[in-house]
């Protein structure tokens, strides 16, 4: 089994071993405190607003096992702009697409449920739908350092960029800013490249925020602002203004290991993930202030995924113990934890959660998709309790 390993400090080598891992069933984090001064043995709720609680009744809704006989770790999961189509990519060199409504019709194993798939020339690390094609064109970043865009309906490539010198790409993203479409990619070569997808992928800007350290994550402000957040193997995250890329606006330097992800919760708040085993929420309007640090999941060497649900205020991370951890942005402890493992291809000691994605189009219904190092997808959904 091949995993998606993070670049490490100082020389960005790829780690070659996997921790012993174990899975467990779903549970919620302890939320009731016992008062030591109470004469009764009954639990007493103290400072209820400060006690983590899960406001969403999440449960398993569908499973998609991997039909592959080889390595099939899922490195990327993306909903299209409508929230109906799920695209996945990873080690198997395929972009698979699924229709969410079809998967939710039953809880049977949907091993053959893929609406379509596209074979790619290299292993994939990232996917992102182009916002100007209404879910028809998807961009991918691969291990050969190439960004390729595919027409999902026709299942053919429509453009290709090979500007990272053959160094693997870890992240791609797009934004529509003031009517202009901009693409970005981050790579092991230490650069973030931005280009015009409508003009043959013409390179517009290149920045090197970490002095040559690998770039693990790029994300534009999804609310239409001019910021881009960058996660870097030098242990920092950077925020740039795309109108002036000479220097970063902010350097977020609270992590002790590689920053694998940087996600916008809103235009003023960024959540970062790191192989130091923590997530951090940052107030970027007030310099580099850490609002909250989230701990509970296990992450020391792999890309495990990070997704935020902007409507519901949730932060979701995968984990190297094959569990999904859901945090409410208000509290540092997880409010919901669930072990994957409805397939047993490799045995529980070798699996971990390698990608997660939250559906963004709903406000009163939560849909969470988690992908594993065994190539399986599990979909959880639920309404507000």
Curated annotation (Swiss-Prot):
<dbReference type="InterPro" id="IPR015943">
    <property type="entry name" value="WD40/YVTN_repeat-like_dom_sf"/>
</dbReference>
<feature type="repeat" description="WD 3">
    <location>
        <begin position="163"/>
        <end position="205"/>
    </location>
</feature>
<keyword id="KW-0677">Repeat</keyword>
<dbReference type="InterPro" id="IPR001680">
    <property type="entry name" value="WD40_rpt"/>
</dbReference>
<keyword id="KW-0287">Flowering</keyword>
<keyword id="KW-0963">Cytoplasm</keyword>
<dbReference type="InterPro" id="IPR036322">
    <property type="entry name" value="WD40_repeat_dom_sf"/>
</dbReference>
<comment type="subunit">
    <text>Interacts with UVR8. Interacts directly with DHU1.</text>
</comment>
<keyword id="KW-0539">Nucleus</keyword>
<dbReference type="GO" id="GO:0005634">
    <property type="term" value="C:nucleus"/>
</dbReference>
<dbReference type="GO" id="GO:0010114">
    <property type="term" value="P:response to red light"/>
</dbReference>
<feature type="repeat" description="WD 1">
    <location>
        <begin position="69"/>
        <end position="108"/>
    </location>
</feature>
<protein>
    <recommendedName>
        <fullName>WD repeat-containing protein RUP1</fullName>
    </recommendedName>
</protein>
<feature type="repeat" description="WD 4">
    <location>
        <begin position="210"/>
        <end position="250"/>
    </location>
</feature>
<dbReference type="GO" id="GO:0080008">
    <property type="term" value="C:Cul4-RING E3 ubiquitin ligase complex"/>
</dbReference>
<feature type="repeat" description="WD 5">
    <location>
        <begin position="254"/>
        <end position="292"/>
    </location>
</feature>
<dbReference type="GO" id="GO:0043254">
    <property type="term" value="P:regulation of protein-containing complex assembly"/>
</dbReference>
<keyword id="KW-0853">WD repeat</keyword>
<feature type="repeat" description="WD 6">
    <location>
        <begin position="298"/>
        <end position="337"/>
    </location>
</feature>
<dbReference type="InterPro" id="IPR044616">
    <property type="entry name" value="RUP1/2"/>
</dbReference>
<dbReference type="Pfam" id="PF00400">
    <property type="entry name" value="WD40"/>
</dbReference>
<comment type="function">
    <text>Functions in association with RUP2 as repressor of UV-B-induced photomorphogenesis mediated by UVR8 and HY5, likely in coordination with DHU1. Plays a crucial negative feedback regulatory role downstream of UVR8-COP1 to inhibit UVR8 function, balance UV-B-specific responses and ensure normal plant growth. Is involved in the regulation of photoperiodic flowering and vegetative development.</text>
</comment>
<feature type="repeat" description="WD 2">
    <location>
        <begin position="119"/>
        <end position="160"/>
    </location>
</feature>
<dbReference type="GO" id="GO:0009908">
    <property type="term" value="P:flower development"/>
</dbReference>
<dbReference type="GO" id="GO:0010218">
    <property type="term" value="P:response to far red light"/>
</dbReference>
<feature type="repeat" description="WD 7">
    <location>
        <begin position="348"/>
        <end position="385"/>
    </location>
</feature>
<dbReference type="GO" id="GO:0005829">
    <property type="term" value="C:cytosol"/>
</dbReference>
<dbReference type="GO" id="GO:0010224">
    <property type="term" value="P:response to UV-B"/>
</dbReference>
